[in-house]
């Protein structure tokens, strides 16, 4: 599909991830394929698992999970499928979100705007693209960062944003993308992100996925992600979109 018009209703909606796509940690943790090795991440995951088990999730179901999003989603699915009341579900999710939120704050305290983020967003805006943001970060984190001068107030470019606080299930589940599509009233979109969870959510929601390779993935890892295109920075995105 080729979109050359500057009418935003004839161009795909462009959705962005935040961490690793628009901003990044100044001192990047070591990543091997899709897993990130960082001491604090392990501690957070252990805390999340302990909370899940405390609320009745079998330890054998969560102990093998090595991603925070997987722990979150599995716990949510378990309590929903086992007849927990809505009030109890909210308690479980709130408690599991406490260490998640602590990790948000720690990561963002040492994050910075990626080069070319603002120039790339401005170029897309001038060409008439409608843009939105879908992140696994909390609403508090997104609102603080996206409106801060140190991060270029990049939130000004997005009419809509969806964070984990508005969702039952988070990426790699497609729910966050489905929610923003419903808000905007669109079903044609391109999602720009840096992880396997971004790729999986985008494909599951029926969109195109553009990998921004800020993690320096090798060729084999990129193939596993199965992106529709690969860019190194956001200034390359508009040209890439012209080829869809």
Regions found by a protein language model. Give the residues of each.
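Histidine/lysine/aspartate-rich catalytic loop segments that bind and position anionic ligands
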Residues: 135-171
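Short acidic-hydrophobic, aromatic-tinged amphipathic segments that line or gate anion-handling sites
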Residues: 229-236
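Active-site neighborhood of HAD-like aspartate-dependent phosphohydrolases
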Residues: 2-64
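Short, acidic loop-to-helix structural element flanking the phosphoryl-transfer center
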Residues: 105-133, 143, 174
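Acidic, Mg2+-coordinating phosphoryl-transfer loop and its flanking beta/alpha structural elements
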Residues: 190-229
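Metal-dependent phosphoesterase signature
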Residues: 76-119
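Surface-exposed amphipathic alpha-helices with a cationic face
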Residues: 121-125, 181, 199-203
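Conserved Lys-Pro-Asp/Glu-containing loop-to-beta segment of HAD-superfamily phosphomonoesterases
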Residues: 9-10, 170-199
């Amino acid at each position: 599909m080729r979109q050359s018009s500057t009418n935003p209703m004839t161009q795909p909606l462009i959705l962005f991830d935040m961490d690793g796509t628009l901003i990044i940690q100044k001192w990047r943790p070591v990543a091997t394929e899709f897993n990130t090795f960082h001491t604090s991440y392990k501690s957070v995951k252990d805390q999340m698992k302990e909370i899940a088990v405390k609320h009745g999730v079998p330890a054998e179901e969560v102990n093998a999970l090595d991603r925070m999003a997987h722990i979150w989603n599995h716990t949510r699915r378990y309590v929903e499928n086992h007849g927990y009341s809505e009030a109890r579900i909210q308690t479980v999710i709130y408690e599991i979100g406490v260490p998640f939120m602590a990790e948000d704050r720690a990561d963002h305290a040492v994050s910075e705007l990626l080069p070319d983020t603002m120039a790339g967003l401005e170029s897309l805006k001038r060409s008439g693209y409608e843009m939105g943001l879908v992140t696994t970060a909390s609403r508090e984190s997104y609102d603080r960062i996206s409106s801060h001068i140190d991060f270029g107030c990049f939130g000004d470019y997005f009419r809509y944003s969806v964070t984990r606080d508005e969702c039952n299930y988070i990426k790699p589940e497609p729910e966050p993308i489905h929610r923003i599509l419903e808000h905007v009233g669109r079903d044609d979109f391109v999602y720009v992100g840096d992880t396997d969870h971004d790729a999986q959510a985008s494909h599951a929601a029926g969109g195109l996925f553009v990998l921004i390779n800020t993690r320096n993935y090798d060729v084999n890892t990129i193939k596993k992600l199965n992106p529709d295109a690969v860019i190194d920075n956001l200034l390359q995105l508009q040209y890439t979109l012209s080829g869809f």
